[in-house]
Amino acid sequence: VSLLEAFEPVAHDLRAAGLDCQLAEDPNPGEPAAGATAVLIVSGVKVGRLTLGASVLDTASRTLYLAAQTQRLVQGNLSIGGRVIEWPPCLPSHAHPMMATRGQRAPLWTCPLGGEVSVPIGQHP
């Protein structure tokens, strides 16, 4: 599974939150043996580089790895009106984002307060 294919569930969840996203070719990709890279652009802002190591083989692990990277890049490098983007949002009563975790069958976005609330990555409302 390519970086683009593994990223598609993450892209769905960005779009569900009203954030436009695209991957652009990395102008400095480095050694091909190190894995695939792409530049992540969210709402018109280049937020950073995604990397997918060659050793990350299964689709669920690839998606989980990209989701965690994307979350760090969005929270660290994107703000709207001076406000940090808490993505992906948790319950409306929670003032924090969900976190990427490994589920039994699929990668999940999970509430960091106990983990009782979760949704598969790619199905965030």
Question: Language-model features: where?
Answer:
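Long, charged N-terminal interaction/targeting segments
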Residues: V1-Y65
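Cys/His-clustered metal-coordination modules, chiefly Zn-binding fingers
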Residues: A54-P125
